[in-house]
Swiss-Prot record:
Enzyme Commission number: 4.3.3.7
HAMAP family: DapA (MF_00418)
Gene Ontology CC: cytoplasm
Domain of life: Bacteria
Organism in which the protein naturally occurs: Rickettsia prowazekii (strain Madrid E)
Active site: Y135 (proton donor/acceptor), K163 (schiff-base intermediate with substrate)
Protein name, per record: 4-hydroxy-tetrahydrodipicolinate synthase
Single Gene Ontology MF annotation: (R,S)-4-hydroxy-2-oxoglutarate aldolase activity
């Protein structure tokens, strides 16, 4: 099975207008990603405010994205839920709609044991034959995969990757030492993208590439072409933007940045609220200094 979990993947924002999905803005955003040759997009993840979507909105968001992209790049759906039956429903619907694969985190809030985490993903794996990426974001979910659980899950044939949002630089090396075969590790933390690539990860799931897809793509291309200095220079240039996009809870800052660039309305759903005036000021200043235009 071809492993598409590699390269630059954008954790896409979900545009809203008047408390509804803004499908016109979605088309513009997706076409910008395709224009800059982003390797794949993640729809309805944390950055995409998945928890605020109704099931009907979730289906509409995926279906519209699949239609717009029209096989021009892979689409990954977010299927995280602390209700295993509902996570399975999301995965099955993703398959029906035509996405290429899906990502899921350990169930949040309920604090399952490692065995419970394994059984959750085993159930997902048995219910839907799409490729699966594990999503490690313990600051959000409250629980994480142990290395041993990752090893067990990697033996299920369609669990092919791990998105690691942490900063433990030893973790990719530990996992690569015990997990054999076609299993990819990607970083989901923009600030440590190069540090993690130096430890053997093969991809980057980025928030920043919503706003600066061209620069993010150039950074990875330079790294993959062994131009370490060139990659470092772009990374240093982007560092203030990485930090600005996490001044407040993601996706609050990136949604404002997208609005400032004319990509969508600055509309975010409760319990999240729009960026503070202080954050807006910093974001505008950094985008202007980088001469980012869409």
């Amino acid at each position: 099975m071809y492993n598409i979990f590699k390269g630059l993947i954008t954790a896409l924002i979900t545009p809203f207008k008047d408390n509804k999905l803004d499908l016109y803005a979605l088309e513009n955003i997706l076409n910008q990603q395709i224009k800059h040759k982003i390797d794949a997009v993640l729809i309805a993840g944390s950055t995409g405010e998945a928890n605020s979507l109704s099931f009907e909105e979730y289906k509409l968001l995926l279906k519209t994205s699949v239609d717009i992209v029209n096989n021009r790049m892979p689409i990954i759906s977010g299927c995280s839920s602390n209700n295993t039956a509902y996570a399975i429903e999301l995965a099955i619907e993703s398959k029906k709609i035509g996405v290429d694969c899906f990502m899921a985190s350990p169930p949040s809030y309920v604090k399952p044991t490692q065995h419970g985490i394994y059984k959750h993903f085993e159930a997902l794996h048995e219910a839907c034959n799409l490729p699966i990426m594990l999503y490690s974001a313990p600051t959000r979910s409250g629980v994480d995969f142990s290395d041993e659980t990752i090893l067990r899950l990697s033996k299920l044939p369609r669990i092919l990757a791990l998105k690691d949002c942490g900063v433990d630089l030893e973790r990719p090396m530990r996992i690569r030492a015990i997990v054999k075969g076609d299993f990819n590790i990607l970083t989901g933390n923009d600030e440590v993208v190069l540090a993690f690539h130096a430890q053997g990860v093969v991809g980057w799931i980025s928030v920043t590439s919503n706003i600066a897809p061209k620069l993010c793509k150039e950074l990875l291309e330079k790294w993959y072409n062994n131009d370490t200095q060139g990659a470092l220079e772009i990374h240093q240039k982007l560092l203030p933007l990485y930090k600005a996009l996490f001044l407040e809870s993601n996706p609050i800052p990136v949604k404002y940045a997208a609005y400032y660039l004319g990509l969508c309305e600055n509309e975010i759903r409760l319990p999240l609220t729009e960026a503070s005036d202080s954050a807006k000021k910093q974001i505008k200043k950094i985008i202007t200094s980088l001469s980012i235009k869409i």
